[in-house]
Amino acid sequence: MTNKPDRVVLIGVAGDSGCGKSTFLRRLADLFGDEFITVICLDDYHSLDRKQRKEAGVTALNPKANNFDLMYEQIKALKNGESINKPIYNHETGMIDPPEIIEPNHIIVVEGLHPLYDERVRELLDFSVYLDISDEVKIAWKIQRDMAERGHTYEDVLAAINSRRPDFKAYIDPQKEFADVVVRVLPTQLIKDDTERKVLRVQMIQRDGVEGFEPAYLFDEGSTIDWIPCGRKLTCSYPGIRMHYGPDTYYGHN
């Protein structure tokens, strides 16, 4: 980065492992460029490596396996325009690598399992998003990612999913209560008995009353749009689109 920003905007993106956070943000960073946006994976603040977690009988989702004090101090420093020496968690080896220098940037996105868990970190954020992925979709995505990108076996992935589920319910899922926007991804209702998970149902839920953030209005409130491609012909492989906009209650919020 060549110019020090006048103000650092801090965005938090929370969600379970394998829900698409890193993939989405890598593409966002490619779009805006490194001179404008920096993405930090909060896995880098694991205080225990993979072997140590196994020996201690804890998962990476457990707060005991993460250094929230260092996370808070370094994110606060970046927000104040200061550079940091951030640790690196190596997903391939499961080890903690030597730190790297991170400079402040116009937009810094902190993504991972716990950006909304610690109140101190949460209060630093200017805006927050929680990715709420259904179990059916999450399992399909995580198997694809961990086997292709991280060298895990199918059995290892399934075992990890089952062992992490209690900690997800205890430490990760409750964070959506604090998010400004929740993006829910569920299996489609347009294809009967869909198993490929290539067509998905997506809901974007925006909290009312967030300062400086106006909700997106796609069409009139209460409207529903149905589009069936090709009419009754059988030449289209895609099922179409169904859209609805209107008020709702989610996790106790309107």
Regions found by a protein language model. Give the residues of each.
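The conserved Walker
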Residues: 17
